[in-house]
Amino acid sequence: SSKIKISGIDVIDPSFGMEAIWIESHKQAEAESTGYMVVEPESVLATHFSRILFRNAGKLIGQDDVQSLLDNLSESAPQLVQSVIPKIVPLHSLTGVMRLFLDERVPISDLRQVLETLSGMNLTNMSIQDMSEALRPDLAGLLIQRLAPLNEPLPVITFSSGLEHMLINMVRQSGEEGLVLDNALAQKLITSLVQANEKIGAEGKQAALVVSPAIRRQISAIVRQHIEDIVVMGLSLIHI
C-alpha cells in the first residue's frame, strides 16, 4: 500500500473489507508508480461474486447436485456408493451433511472418505449435525490445506482457558437449548475475535478459531453470524 494520496473515490473493498480507491483508467500508471496495487474492475467484480457464491454454497447445493457427485464416484467406487447410499444414509441426510460442511468452509471434494467413514459408523439416533461433527476429523487435512499453504504455519485464535471452561460449563448446563450468551459477553467475545481476525487477515492469511470439541458447534453457530470468513475448528483436529 502507499501513503501517498491519489484522487479517486474512497471505498471499502467488498470482498476483503480493506480500504481502496476507485480511479479512472488513465490514472493507473500514476497509481502504480506511487506504490498502489491496481486491480481491474472485472477482477474485483469476479472476486466479489465468487466469494458470494462461496459463502452461500450451502444454500445452493441440493440433492440432485449430491447425486451427481455420487454418480461420479460410482465410476471408481461403485460398491462403496451402493453399500452406503441409501442403505445406510439416505440421500437427503447426506445432502444435509454436505450443506453443513459448505456452510463451515469444509471441503467436500473427498466424498470417498466421507462414505468410507459413514460405512463404519453406528448412525442410530444420530442427527445430521452429529454426523457432520463425527466426520470432521477425517476431513481435517483438507480443511487445513485450504487455510494454510503446504509447510506454512496455520494462524490460530484461541480463548483463554478460563473463558473456555466457562463456555463448556454453560453448554453442559443449557442442554438442548444450546449456548446462550448474555449481550455483554457476546459483544466482548465478538469484538475480540473481529480484531484478532482482522489482524491476521491484514497479513493476507486465513485464521482458524480453535476451541474444545465440546463447544465447537455452538461457538461456530454464534461466531459465523458476525464473522463470515472465520473457520471454527475443534482442538482434536489439530495435531501438534
Predicted regions and their residues:
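Membrane-embedded alpha-helical signal segments
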Residues: 1-238
